[in-house]
């Protein structure tokens, strides 16, 4: 596989942004160690925006010959008050539920979970030189920049927070350098931390990424954030600028069960959630059901996606590209209910191996039902 083919795998849907493609090409060309990482807070049930979006990209990275790693951010979750702010509970959930759920998600998206290294944050945070790296980074970042970066925690600028939360962004940047990560991966909501990492990379004294004497900047790969199924807080949305302002409120949320499908949901739960989903007729710009179709079903194109309908409503129709589907929906040739039902059936089949695993091994879900899920 040549360099351009490997780059195309990194750019493949659901990737939304690479900072930068030129730097990625440079890493391939100089033969730098290719170490990926994606970090997750341990905060509740795994939904499709976490399991399938990250799983899809991990599969792509593996095909491109990149070592893959999942960072189970237990301390970060504690700082951000997840699971009642109980560090021991967070660690138990990380190892007994989250790790298993992500392994199964990677598998259904075509990756090999056996080739993913899982690292618990506390395994490295106990090392003294980790905190040297945190301080080194912090000395190169202003307080106002840190305050603007708290949105990576799902917090709003101006929100009242405890001091520990100001350490969080610098820890997230330190995680990259301390682990020798050359490809930092996350959803678009983590962009601010990754931009800081790129900007400070060549200023660091502790744990810079060095290859053949050159201080390297990490590449940041950001995947699409699936829209939540709920109606947006403002409707209609009249501009792209307005959409950007409320996008954070439109993503899937573990605390709003009907905004998300979880990887273990039953067929009936999936159908019910899709039936209730916001999906206005002819609306193609701000439509969560179409958004899911584009980034899950039509991740690979061409594909075959068949929508079953009674003959009196046009009969079955098969689409091979998302643009075909989008065009028919925009023209009113495809009814929202038919689209919802077809997407639900696709997800039911896709998630079947995960569902069956948890039916055979109920202990992880039993653990989750016993813990306090917060935020």
Curated annotation (Swiss-Prot):
Residue numbers covered by motif 'KMSKS' region: 251-255
Main location: cytoplasm
Gene: tyrS
Cellular compartments per GO CC: cytoplasm
An annotated Gene Ontology molecular function: tyrosine-tRNA ligase activity
Its EC number(s): 6.1.1.1
GO biological process: tyrosyl-tRNA aminoacylation
Name of the featured protein: Tyrosine--tRNA ligase
A Pfam family recorded for this sequence: tRNA-synt_1b
Domain of life: Archaea
Keyword Cell wall biogenesis/degradation part of the UniProt annotation: no
Organism: Pyrococcus abyssi (strain GE5 / Orsay)
Binding site for ATP: 254
Subcellular location(s) of the protein: Cytoplasm
